[in-house]
Amino acid sequence: MSPQTETKAGVGFKAGVKEYKLTYYTPEYETKDTDILAAFRVTPQPGVPPEERGAAVAAESSTGTWTTVWTDGLTSLDRYKGRCYHIEPVPGEEDQFIAYVAYPLDLFEEGSVTNMFTSIVGNVFGFKALRALRLEDLRIPVAYVKTFQGPPHGIQVERDKLNKYGRPLLGCTIKPKLGLSAKNYGRAVYECLRGGLDFTKDDENVNSQPFMRWRDRFLFCAEAIYKSQAETGEIKGHYLNATAGTCEEMIKRAVFARELGVPIVMHDYLTGGFTANTSLSHYCRDNGLLLHIHRAMHAVIDRQKNHGMHFRVLAKALRMSGGDHIHSGTVVGKLEGERDITLGFVDLLRDDYIEKDRSRGIYFTQDWVSLPGVLPVASRGIHVWHMPALTEIFGDDSVLQFGGGTLGHPWGNAPGAVANRVALEACVKARNEGRDLASEGGEIIREACKWSP
């Protein structure tokens, strides 16, 4: 039975429940170079046609609501509406399909990841006509990319600042993550940097707690950096976590880091928020600080296979919002990561131009034009025996971040750092000599053990 409608006197206006596909499903539409394109994995409620559900996603994430409203006549829906322009099945999943949606660029505020996500994913994921919804990928048009500053410095500028070339960078997260005093924390930082690491790191939940206030930590870490630099002749850094309860406090911590003369600060970009992250990124570029990004909370958003957002979308958003490093998974180690899929979004972080490649999860060709690249950080559950695989998989433009793989060395922190550095240099040397790291990795590490703790 058709829904009841009410006619407004004199204007011929009809209210009532409308099928979304009548307005928002447009398979004949040819996408524009300026459109933001989205690929959604849709799991509809039983009995609902794919065209209607795909159109509903386009409508509820752009101009639509459940009925026609009289103010529709005061604007041009054809100019501003999102369009579901293509639907394809998901192989092996009878109840799922991919809906491709095109959004006009005028729907989004320039230079605002916050506004982009508020529009595309802010409301539609709670739509009861859908059992589940996942944003698999976005195509960001060049016209929109150019409204963002992006990373504060990028890969090449970071290497020039550090004067380190031809190999991955080495890092270590200080453990235990919580409970150390600032002085003992600084001691661990010094031992790791003195042993040969390029960076050490605050854990994501180290902010300013009663056992270690942020200012004390910054001071002792700066002392460790300068002492290790003087003794090794290398430029060193520690990711000082500036994440705070307010943007004002976050910037205050970054200002203090700059006054100490340290090279890099850190931010938890998902828990801190994109507005805060973009603000910090702008400050870092203006003041010569590198910015390390941790993705704490990402698995809440990206781990479910049929609901939420894939990490490649969060990675693209970070490149737009700004960060010089971001944690990206390891493929090896204790956290999840499929090799081809992980390398797909690693390339989206580093490269200027990435072709569509569905085998790697890349739904759209992405052109970043002149936006600087981001170094992927491989971390969590890795140690020296993973070094050949990590060197082969991630290449030179990466940060290999060890925690227990450094601090868990039976001889102490400094020998653990020495072991990491010796293993890395052995793998890079073997690779440059043409040896196969995949098949000879164990032998390469055993040879290196003769010259390392």
From Swiss-Prot:
Site label Transition state stabilizer, positions: 334
Residues annotated as binding substrate: 123, 173, 177, 295, 327, 379
Keywords per UniProt: Acetylation, Calvin cycle, Carbon dioxide fixation, Chloroplast, Disulfide bond, Lyase, Magnesium, Metal-binding, Methylation, Monooxygenase, Oxidoreductase, Photorespiration, Photosynthesis, Plastid
Other remarks on this protein: The basic functional RuBisCO is composed of a large chain homodimer in a 'head-to-tail' conformation. In form I RuBisCO this homodimer is arranged in a barrel-like tetramer with the small subunits forming a tetrameric 'cap' on each end of the 'barrel'.
NCBIfam families per UniProt: PRK04208.1
Catalytic activity: 2 (2R)-3-phosphoglycerate + 2 H(+) = D-ribulose 1,5-bisphosphate + CO2 + H2O; D-ribulose 1,5-bisphosphate + O2 = 2-phosphoglycolate + (2R)-3-phosphoglycerate + 2 H(+)
Cofactor binding summary note: Binds 1 Mg(2+) ion per subunit.
GO molecular function, one term: magnesium ion binding
Modified residues (N6,N6,N6-trimethyllysine): 14
Residue span(s) of the pro-peptide: 1-2
Description of how the protein assembles with itself and partners: Heterohexadecamer of 8 large chains and 8 small chains; disulfide-linked. The disulfide link is formed within the large subunit homodimers.
GO biological process: photorespiration; reductive pentose-phosphate cycle
Keyword Lyase belongs to the record: yes
Binding locations of Mg(2+): 201, 203-204
Entry comment on modification after translation: The disulfide bond which can form in the large chain dimeric partners within the hexadecamer appears to be associated with oxidative stress and protein turnover.
Modified-residue entries (N-acetylproline), positions: 3
The enzyme's E.C. designation: 4.1.1.39
Name listed for the protein in its UniProt record: Ribulose bisphosphate carboxylase large chain
Signal peptide annotation: none
Lineage: Eukaryota, Viridiplantae, Streptophyta, Embryophyta, Tracheophyta
GO CC term, one of those recorded: chloroplast
Cofactor: Mg(2+)
Active site: 175 (proton acceptor), 294 (proton acceptor)
Sequence similarity: Belongs to the RuBisCO large chain family. Type I subfamily.
Entry function: RuBisCO catalyzes two reactions: the carboxylation of D-ribulose 1,5-bisphosphate, the primary event in carbon dioxide fixation, as well as the oxidative fragmentation of the pentose substrate in the photorespiration process. Both reactions occur simultaneously and in competition at the same active site.
